[in-house]
């Protein structure tokens, strides 16, 4: 029942793992260089793709997105990698900084359960998703970014531009708890 946190070399990847551990969610932080077979051997119920400085340093993350049929949550760079893997567009933001942002939750099912209609988050906007792929829908937006969060319409694949693992996102732990519930539900249905 373990969720693997894929370390994309971002400064907060260890905090993602610690946040999950604090919530008593079984987790392991693994490098983004593991092969598909090495990930499969760990038998995860879900993947969280952490943030990182660049797509070029994302290792095998895009392969994981394309290969695995388990719940996936992409955070910041992970969010952008999901968009890229499915054919969305990523580009430089108009505001290249970290900022406290109020997001508007437009779909509060599953990942945002219990959090609507608005949520204060800590978000990085150096790069962002400019257009979502086919078969995706927007879950949240803000005055800085049209795509703060999205999900696949048929798969348990989610992306968020912001960082739920930092204290600047006061209700970030609820995102992780909701994702764990998605993973457990999926595991029980398979």
UniProtKB/Swiss-Prot annotation:
Keywords: ATP-binding, Glutamine amidotransferase, GMP biosynthesis, Ligase, Nucleotide-binding, Purine biosynthesis. The keyword Ubl conjugation does not apply. GO terms for molecular function: ATP binding; GMP synthase activity. Its EC number is 6.3.5.2. It catalyses: XMP + L-glutamine + ATP + H2O = GMP + L-glutamate + AMP + diphosphate + 2 H(+). Residues 2-189 form the Glutamine amidotransferase type-1 domain. One of its GO terms (cellular component) is cytosol. InterPro entries: Class_I_gatase-like, GATASE, GMP_synth_GATase, GMP_synthase_A. Pathway: Purine metabolism; GMP biosynthesis; GMP from XMP (L-Gln route): step 1/1. The active site is at residues 76, 163, 165. Heterodimer composed of a glutamine amidotransferase subunit (A) and a GMP-binding subunit (B). Catalyzes the synthesis of GMP from XMP. HAMAP family: GMP_synthase_A (MF_01510). This is GMP synthase [glutamine-hydrolyzing] subunit A.
């Amino acid at each position: 029942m373990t969720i693997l946190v894929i370390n994309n070399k971002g400064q907060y990847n260890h905090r993602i793992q610690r946040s999950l551990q604090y919530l008593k969610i079984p987790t392991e932080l693994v490098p983004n260089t593991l092969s598909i077979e090495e990930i499969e051997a760990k038998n995860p119920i879900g993947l969280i793709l952490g943030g990182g400085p660049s797509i070029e340093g994302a290792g095998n993350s895009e392969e994981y997105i394309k290969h695995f049929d388990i719940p996936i949550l992409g955070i910041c760079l992970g969010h952008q990698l999901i968009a890229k893997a499915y054919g969305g567009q990523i580009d430089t933001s108009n505001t290249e900084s970290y900022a406290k942002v109020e997001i508007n939750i437009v779909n509060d099912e599953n990942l945002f359960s219990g959090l609507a209609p608005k949520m204060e988050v800590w978000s990085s906007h150096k790069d962002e998703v400019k257009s979502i792929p086919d078969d995706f829908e927007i879950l949240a937006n803000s005055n800085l970014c049209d795509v703060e969060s999205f999900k696949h319409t048929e798969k348990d694949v989610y992306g968020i531009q912001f960082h739920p693992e930092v204290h600047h996102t006061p209700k970030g732990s609820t995102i992780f708890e909701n994702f764990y519930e998605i993973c457990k539900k999926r595991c029980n249905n398979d």
